[in-house]
Amino acid sequence: MRYLDNVNQSITERRDIVIETAFKLFAENRIEPVTMTVVADNCNMGVASIYRYFGTKKELVIAVATKKWREYYGELQRHYNELNVEKMTAAQELEFYIDRYIDLYKENSDLLNFNANFSIYIASEDTTKDEMKPYNSIIDKFVNKFHILYKKAQDDKTVRTDISEKSIFYNVMYAMLSALSKYSSGIIHSADQDRNYEKEICQLKDMYFEYYCRK
C-alpha cells in the first residue's frame, strides 16, 4: 500500500511540475506557440511522459487554468474570511471583489496574461462541455459568491437589483478582468510613456460603483 501511495504521489508531483512549467510558458509566450515538446524540454522530461499525464495539449491547458483559478479562489476565500466580508453590505462586498481583481494586476500578472489567451485558445478548439467541466466547476464557485452578494443587495439595497444578477456579474467581473488583462499584457495603445494605468483602473472601478451602487 505504501508503494502505491508513493507512486501516486510521484505522479501527482510530476503533473504539478508540468502544470507549473506550462503555466509560465503560456503566460510569457501565449498558448498557441508553445508545443508539448517545449513543455517537456522545460520540465526535463521526455515528451512521451507529458502525454502520459495529459493526453492532449488542450487537456493540459484546461488543467493549468483549473489549478490556477482554484488557487486564486483559495486566496479569495482566505481574504473573505479574514475581512469578515459576510458582514459587509452588498456594495462593500462588491468593492472587495473588484479590489481582489485589481490585486491580480498588481501581484499576479502571469494569471491575467494566461487567462486572456486561454479564452482565445479554447474558442479556437473543438472543446466539449465534459472537457471544460473541471474548469467550470471552479468558475461556478465565483458565480455562487456573486449570487450571495446579489441576494444581500435585495435586502440592503446598496447595489442595484433592477438590473439582473447575470448582467451585473458579466458586466463588472468579466469586463473588469478583460480590461485588467489588456493593461497587464500592455496591448492597450498609448503614445504617452508616463501613462498611469493604476489610476485608470481605479477610475474604471469608480465608474462601476457610480452606475451599480446606491448612493
Question: What is each stretch, according to the model?
Answer:
Residues 21-25, 175:
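Short amphipathic alpha-helical elements of helix-turn-helix/winged-helix folds
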Residues 92, 137-139, 155-173:
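All-alpha amphipathic helical-bundle segments outside canonical DNA-binding/catalytic cores
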Residues 2, 6, 17, 25-63, ...:
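Helix-turn-helix
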Residues 1-2, 100-103, 144, 148-156, ...:
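C-terminal peripheral helix-coil segments that are non-catalytic and often amphipathic
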Residues 63, 78-108, 165-172, 198:
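Hydrophobic alpha-helical connector segments
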